[in-house]
């Protein structure tokens, strides 16, 4: 285990970004690395402000009925324990399925909102967050805001805002955050502060003078825009609507499986943050732009008391990940903030622990970061460990920031589903096109929950199964007295020969685990399902049988990319209800629809 804790390595950012001695460069994929972190980069705020309200605040109550297409539940099957030493669960659980308490279609084919309709990019890159009264969804480069039944609204799933480009949150901010509408934007609800966090990466290098504002010089405050000037977010403008395509034609789809063209060696990238000033996502936002030296792909934000942690990949052709954290305390009050990053070579996609609930880690506790073992670019498709790091951030003295690890946690052997990402994997009925599985990575979210006298971390990824399908490998780790994760239980959910993959997990206030995932195969079009377990159940089993959220009605034939990720969110109103979003195809559709659903596991109810 290597520890970086050397003051002489720190260089404060005086230009667009600061790279430390021995800092981050793109790594030759043929050169194995030891997964240790580089020294810390410190990024100053390029610009920040407080926006005008995003849209008109609406408290209107709707009595219009909601139509949910909820599908039948699988029949009850007798329970058997897995054989000793075998973590693959080949039969369903013996408990009734989780109760579906809400279900409606989100962004995608068939969606219409106050700003009309839109075309949606592939993959969907689904992101979902849930607050006291609202649900916010982002699909690749579009966003929408929905009602949530409760004190303010009498119905769930009514669109209040959208579909709009995600960059609409940055209208009036200037620079690349306003000008460029890239995909992979992600939303989180910070339950500890009742705020909404939107993170949007900028994928193209910033080279023109209009975009490249540069970071502040030493001693110079971050640039601020005037609050509420014309052109800042107000009522959203209707998106341009192209004319309808001729009959029997399909819209052009960019082949996202082809490698991106090489970027010029000049210019930097940017990461854009918007943090709401209150619990209403239609209100104003504190907005920030940071520049980064490395390509900021696939961000996976996580809420932790001392920061918002946002790891990113640096591209599909390199084995190098950027692990960053931004100063949450400063951002919550709209103050000038910094971002600290390290580079970790030779590792798969990283995920940082994301807090579920309001029971926080002990003061000063480091954030836990994890990745699957193996490396697809080295053709290492299997392993028997999960890698873990401890990220200690020091905002007063960044020289003391360090990332300890990796710790290699032994787990049951696994093989990446279909050998990793961008592979022809999941078959579909009557179609030659197979779908991608993203089998090389732990999926968002990496869940942290403090319940009772212990602290748990839940992780999921997609693995091959004995029957030749795909299964959801899941883990619960617990932190020991040294704050190191130790395996508590694990399992692979594969009750038949179908494919279950692209999972996302959550843990409710009772310590119950719920997992949503895509389901499909040669006999079934891809849809969305949900399974789980109670904290008191036998270890290593998902005892709560599958609930069906959405059943696919057609095959996706225009691209192999499927979702890239799904997402869960725990409802802050009761700390029990688990929300989930994923894709499915309607009959005759040429692109995806998304289904948003809410589940409640047995025995968890009531306000927190």
Predicted regions: what they are:
Residues 11-19:
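Bacterial N-terminal signal peptides
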Residues 2-10:
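Bacterial N-terminal signal peptides that target proteins for export
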Residues 15, 235-236:
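N-terminal leader/targeting segments
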Residues 25-232, 240-246, 251-608:
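C-terminal PAP-associated
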């Amino acid at each position: 285990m290597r520890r970086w804790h050397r003051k002489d390595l720190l260089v404060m950012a005086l230009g667009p970004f600061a790279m430390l001695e021995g800092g981050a460069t793109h790594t030759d994929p043929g050169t194995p690395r030891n997964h240790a972190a580089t020294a810390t980069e410190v990024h100053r705020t390029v610009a920040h402000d407080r926006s005008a309200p995003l849209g008109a605040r609406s408290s209107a109550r709707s009595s219009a009925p909601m139509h949910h297409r909820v599908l039948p539940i699988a029949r009850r099957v007798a329970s058997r324990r897995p054989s000793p030493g075998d973590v693959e669960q080949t039969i369903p659980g013996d408990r009734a399925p989780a109760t579906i308490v809400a279900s409606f279609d989100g962004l995608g084919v068939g969606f219409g909102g106050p700003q009309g309709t839109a075309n949606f990019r592939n993959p969907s890159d689904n992101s979902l967050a849930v607050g006291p009264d609202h649900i916010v969804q982002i699909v690749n480069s579009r966003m929408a805001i929905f009602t949530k039944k409760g004190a303010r609204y009498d119905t769930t799933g009514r669109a209040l805002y959208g579909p709009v480009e995600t960059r609409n949150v940055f209208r009036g901010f200037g620079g690349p955050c306003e000008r460029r509408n890239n995909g992979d934007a992600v939303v989180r609800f910070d339950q500890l502060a009742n705020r909404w966090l939107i993170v949007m990466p900028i994928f193209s290098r910033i080279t023109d003078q209009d975009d490249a504002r540069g970071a502040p010089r030493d001693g110079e405050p971050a640039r601020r825009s005037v609050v509420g000037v014309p052109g800042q977010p107000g009522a959203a403008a209707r998106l341009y609507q192209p004319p309808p395509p001729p009959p029997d034609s399909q819209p052009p789809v960019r082949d996202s499986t082809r490698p991106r063209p090489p970027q010029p060696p000049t210019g930097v990238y940017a990461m854009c943050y918007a943090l709401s000033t209150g619990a209403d996502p239609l209100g104003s936002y504190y907005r920030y732009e940071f520049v980064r030296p490395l390509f900021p792909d696939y961000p996976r934000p996580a809420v932790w008391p001392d920061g918002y942690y946002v790891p990113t990949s640096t591209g599909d052709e390199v084995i190098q990940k950027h692990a960053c954290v931004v100063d949450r305390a400063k951002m919550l009050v709209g103050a000038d903030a910094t971002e600290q990053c390290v580079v970790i070579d030779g590792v798969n996609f990283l995920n940082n622990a994301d807090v579920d609930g309001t029971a926080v880690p002990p003061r000063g506790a480091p954030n836990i970061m994890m990745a699957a073992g193996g490396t697809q670019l080295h053709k290492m498709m299997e392993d028997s460990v999960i890698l873990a790091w401890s990220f200690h951030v020091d905002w007063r003295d960044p020289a003391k920031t360090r990332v300890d690890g990796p710790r290699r946690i032994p787990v049951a052997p696994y093989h990446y589903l279909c050998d990793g990402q961008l592979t022809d994997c999941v078959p579909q009925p009557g179609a030659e096109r197979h779908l991608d599985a993203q089998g090389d990575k732990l999926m968002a979210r990496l869940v942290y929950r403090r319940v009772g006298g212990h602290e748990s971390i839940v992780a999921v990824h997609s693995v091959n199964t004995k029957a030749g399908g795909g299964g959801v490998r899941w883990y619960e780790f617990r932190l020991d007295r040294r704050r190191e994760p130790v395996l508590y239980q694990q399992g692979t959910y594969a009750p038949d020969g179908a494919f279950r993959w692209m999972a996302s997990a959550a843990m409710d206030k009772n310590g119950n685990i719920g997992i949503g995932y895509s389901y499909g195969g040669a006999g079934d079009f891809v849809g969305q399902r949900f399974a789980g377990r109670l904290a008191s159940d036998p270890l290593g089993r998902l005892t709560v049988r599958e609930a069906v959220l959405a059943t696919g009605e057609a095959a996706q034939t225009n691209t192999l990319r499927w979702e890239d990720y799904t997402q869960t969110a725990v409802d802050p109103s009761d700390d029990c209800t688990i929300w989930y979003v994923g894709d499915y195809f309607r009959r005759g559709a040429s692109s995806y629809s998304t289904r948003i659903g809410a589940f409640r596991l047995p025995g968890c109810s009531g306000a927190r």
